[in-house]
Swiss-Prot record:
Protein's job: Involved in oxygen transport from the lung to the various peripheral tissues.
GO cellular component, one term: haptoglobin-hemoglobin complex
Protein's UniProt name: Hemoglobin subunit alpha-2
Biological processes annotated in GO: hydrogen peroxide catabolic process
GN (gene name): HBA2
Source taxon at top rank: Eukaryota
Chain ranges of the Globin domain: 2-142
Amino acid sequence: MVLSAADKSNVKAAWGKVGSNAGAYGAEALERMFLSFPTTKTYFPHFDLSHGSAQVKGHGEKVAAALTKAVGHLDDLPGTLSDLSDLHAHKLRVDPVNFKLLSHSLLVTLACHHPSDFTPAVHASLDKFLANVSTVLTSKYR
């Protein structure tokens, strides 16, 4: 799915409002995913998955950092996320459906924290962006 100029603008503006909360939102999205889709917990058997756990917060920071990097390189997501794609495909072997579940959880988290900014157009742009990120992260599974 190609991001239009309007999509890119919406994604950059929305992520810009996330700012210093990115790590916290990443952790919240992970917690939301674990609660809503319990099967996703199987990829984190060594984590303390309780609310506010340091491990979930740390992984939320990693997720947020990767997305922040991706937002900064919207025209080269494959190059930007290549290492993460390798990691998830070859070492972690995460089922690709889980990226969609995390994307959904992140969209809900962003909508909860920024309801007035989460217009239908912004929602659609963020959804396309996260779908593109998911596609890149699963590209090396083939």
